[in-house]
Amino acid sequence: MARIAGVDLPNKHVSVALTYIYGISRSSARTICEKARISSACLINDLSQDELAVVRAIIDREYKVEGRLRTEVALNIKRLMDIGCYRGLRHRKGLPVRGQRTRTNARTRKGKRKTVAGKKK
């Protein structure tokens, strides 16, 4: 089992296995395979140590992955909250950020329903 960027990759096609790394999509994985001159249909366990080293070097040099990427995203959200912009306020309140409706739906972002007492007749 190969280990790249602190992630154990399963024995699948290279282009699929690389997507197990946070920050690498299918298209990024294909690009990495092309730059490393590796067939994306090849299995991870079939790669030599030299080929794995080339893939590691490409990822380290050109991509922000795993911890570095998670930290950057968290800092971007924190910056939005600190400057008090609309998106930052929505993050702070735990509401949808990108303009979705909230009268109904938005349960994923808002969490479990809170029961409100009904109006007396």
Curated annotation (Swiss-Prot):
Q: Hydrolase: is it a keyword of this entry?
A: no
- Listed disulfide bonds for this chain? none
Q: Which GO terms describe its biological process?
A: translation
What cellular component terms from Gene Ontology apply here? Answer: cytosol; small ribosomal subunit
What PROSITE patterns does the database record attribute to this sequence?
RIBOSOMAL_S13_1, RIBOSOMAL_S13_2
What superkingdom does the record give?
Answer: Bacteria
State what this protein does. Located at the top of the head of the 30S subunit, it contacts several helices of the 16S rRNA. In the 70S ribosome it contacts the 23S rRNA (bridge B1a) and protein L5 of the 50S subunit (bridge B1b), connecting the 2 subunits; these bridges are implicated in subunit movement. Contacts the tRNAs in the A and P-sites.
Protein known as? Small ribosomal subunit protein uS13
Q: Name the source organism.
A: Treponema pallidum (strain Nichols)
Q: What is the lineage of its organism?
A: Bacteria, Pseudomonadati, Spirochaetota, Spirochaetia, Spirochaetales
